[in-house]
């Protein structure tokens, strides 16, 4: 039976370490080996960086990490859930941000079995990732 786990994360870089540790624990429960867990942690870290900096119109104030976990399969959604965004993003381009086709998304696609970039009706972004054994 699939289990669902959801985290609500402030859109600040200092929370990425916590997110990586949490998703590593979830992946271990789903019975992935150490190399697969490292791949999942790296992909989720890249997705969180992409979503938190590429939220609708600026830096996301918060985002969610949702996992659907069953033995040998992990489905992960990272979604911008902000009601608002930091205004400084509107006046300049973030020099550290990749475009959707850039290295971060390439890394995610190379590490996960399936990757989708989704827009919800409110125009907010979601990165869906699936890893199977």
Task: Spell out what each predicted region is.
Residues 1-6, 51-133:
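Conserved beta-strand-loop-beta-strand hairpin that lines the nucleotide-binding pocket
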Residues 1-42:
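Bergerat-fold GHKL ATPase/HATPase_c domain
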Residues 27, 45-48, 82:
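Residue-level detector of secondary-structure transition/capping positions
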Residues 34-59:
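Conserved ATP-binding N-box helix of the HATPase_c
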């Amino acid at each position: 039976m699939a289990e669902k786990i959801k985290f609500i994360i402030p859109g600040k870089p200092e929370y990425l370490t916590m997110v990586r540790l949490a998703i590593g624990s979830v992946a271990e429960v789903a019975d992935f080996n150490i190399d697969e867990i490292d791949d999942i942690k790296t992909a989720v870290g890249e997705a969180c960086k992409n979503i938190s900096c590429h939220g609708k119109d600026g830096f996301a104030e918060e985002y969610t990490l949702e996992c659907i976990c069953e033995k040998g399969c992990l489905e992960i959604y990272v979604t911008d859930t902000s009601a608002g965004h930091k205004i400084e993003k509107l006046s300049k381009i973030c020099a550290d941000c990749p475009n959707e086709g850039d290295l971060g998304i390439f890394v995610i696609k190379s590490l996960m079995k399936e990757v989708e970039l989704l827009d919800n009706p409110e125009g907010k972004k979601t990165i869906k990732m699936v890893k199977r054994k």
